[in-house]
Design a protein with these regions (language model features):
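Short consensus segments that form the blades of beta-propeller domains
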Residues: 131-135, 168-171, 201-202
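Sec-dependent N-terminal signal peptides
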Residues: 3-16
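Acidic glycine-/aspartate-rich tracts in secreted/extracellular proteins
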Residues: 39, 46-47, 63-69, 115-121, ...
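Acidic Gly/Asp/Thr-rich repetitive segments characteristic of extracellular carbohydrate-active
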Residues: 17-49, 287-320
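Short glycine/acidic-rich loop motifs that flank beta-strands on beta-rich extracellular proteins
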Residues: 48-54, 70-71, 87-97, 119-126, ...
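Short aromatic-glycine-(Arg/Gly/Cys) micro-motifs in beta-strand/loop hairpins
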Residues: 16-18, 271-292
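Right-handed parallel beta-helix/beta-spiral solenoid domain characteristic of secreted/periplasmic
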Residues: 23, 58-125
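Surface-exposed loop/turn motifs in large extracellular/passenger domains
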Residues: 37-40, 67-69, 91-114, 135, ...
C-alpha cells in the first residue's frame, strides 16, 4: 500500500519540473516560490531553519521518496536527517509554524521530513457575539492548514507547540501542537485582518477524507488537540499506522485531547496506530514530576497537559 501510494504520487507529479534544494535554491521557500502547480521540490538532508508557506499544488519531499518505506520507515535516514526547524524571531512574529499550507482548496503532498521547534501561527477567531470579539490564538505548531487539504505522510513531529523555556514570554500553541486544520469562515490569519487580499478560491471539491497516515508524534504541546486539531472540516481524517507517545491499547486509539475535532465534525480513523500503552486508573501531576514518568503517585508527570494525553474514560487526575 505504501509503495503504491508513493509510485502514484510520483506519476501524478511527473509531468512537472523538479527543483532540488539546495542545489537549485538555497532555501526550501525559494524553491517553492519558483515552483508551479504540479512541480516537485526535493530537499537534501540538512537542518533548514525556515517558516515555510505553500499556496500551490506541489509535491514537497525529502530524498525518502526514493527509499523503500514499506517497513521501518521511522528509522529512515532521510526522514530523520531532513529537518525543518521553525524560526521564532522572524520579522513576522505572528508566524511561528514550520509550515503553513493555505487557500484555494489546494492538495499538495508533504513527505519525509522531521518538523521541530514550531510554536504555531496566530489565527483570529471571530466570535458570533452581540459584541464581536476577535481572539488571536496560536495554532498549528508544526503545520497549520487553512482551507487546503494536503496529504501528509512519513514525517516526524517532535517538540512542537511551545517556545524555548529560556525565552521571555513563552509562546504556546492553543490548538494543534503538531498539526491544525481550519475549514471555517469564522477563522482568519492575524496578518489578513483589515486588508484586502487576492486569494485563489478554487472550485475544487472538498475531499471527504484527509490522508495523514504514517506519521510519528513525540512531545508536542498544545492546550487542545495535542497532535491534531480540526475545526470546520466535516470529513474523516485518517491517521492510521501512525506512532503516538501514548495510546489506549485496549481500544487501539488516542483520546480527543490528542486528536481533537471541534464540535466532533470530523472523524479520526486510527487503524493500527502504535505507542506506549496507558493505564486507565489514576494519574498524578506534580511540579516536581517528569513527563517521562508513568504518572503513578510515586512517579508523577509534570504538566496537566501531558496528563490529559494519558487519560482514559475511567481515569482520575490528581495534582500535588
Amino acid at each position: 500500500m505504501k509503495k503504491v501510494f508513493i509510485i502514484f504520487s510520483l506519476i501524478s507529479f511527473s509531468l512537472g519540473s523538479t527543483i532540488n534544494i539546495p542545489n537549485d535554491f538555497p532555501t526550501i521557500q525559494l524553491g517553492i516560490d519558483a515552483a508551479n502547480n504540479g512541480d516537485t521540490v526535493i530537499v537534501a538532508q540538512g537542518i533548514y531553519y525556515e517558516n515555510i508557506t505553500i499556496d500551490k499544488e506541489i509535491f514537497l519531499s525529502s530524498y525518502a521518496i526514493f527509499d523503500n518505506l514499506e517497513n521501518g520507515w521511522i528509522n529512515n535516514e532521510n526522514i530523520q536527517s531532513t529537518i525543518i526547524h521553525a524560526v521564532s524571531d522572524t520579522l513576522n512574529p505572528s508566524f511561528g509554524s514550520c509550515l503553513v499550507v493555505r487557500d484555494g482548496n489546494i492538495a499538495p503532498t508533504i513527505l519525509g521530513f522531521t518538523f521541530m521547534g514550531g510554536i504555531g501561527t496566530v489565527m483570529i477567531e471571530n466570535d458570533n457575539c452581540a459584541i464581536p470579539i476577535n481572539r488571536p490564538e496560536r495554532s498549528g505548531g508544526a503545520i497549520l492548514i487553512f482551507k487546503a487539504y494536503p496529504t501528509i505522510n512519513f514525517n516526524r513531529f517532535i517538540n512542537n507547540g511551545i517556545s524555548n523555556e529560556n525565552e521571555r514570554g513563552r509562546k504556546v500553541s492553543k490548538a494543534g501542537g503538531a498539526i491544525a486544520h481550519y475549514d471555517d469562515a469564522e477563522v482568519e490569519f492575524d496578518e489578513d485582518r483589515n486588508r484586502l487580499i487576492n486569494i485563489n478560491h478554487s472550485i475544487r471539491d472538498i475531499p471527504e477524507q484527509l490522508n495523514i497516515q504514517n506519521n510519528y508524534f513525540e512531545n508536542n504541546t498544545s492546550s487542545d488537540g495535542k497532535n491534531f486539531y480540526s475545526r470546520g472540516y466535516e470529513g474523516s481524517i485518517d491517521v492510521s499506522h501512525s506512532i503516538f507517545d501514548d495510546i489506549d491499547c485496549e481500544s487501539n486509539s488516542v483520546n480527543n485531547f490528542v486528536l481533537k475535532s471541534r464540535d466532533d465534525y470530523a472523524e479520526f480513523i486510527q487503524n493500527e496506530i502504535t505507542g506506549n500503552c496507558i493505564d486507565g486508573n489514576a494519574l498524578y501531576v506534580s511540579v516536581d514530576g517528569d513527563n517521562n514518568n508513568s504518572g503513578s503517585e510515586d512517579y508523577p508527570v509534570k504538566t496537566i497537559g501531558h496528563a490529559f494525553s494519558l487519560v482514559k474514560d475511567d481515569t482520575t487526575i490528581t495534582t500535588t
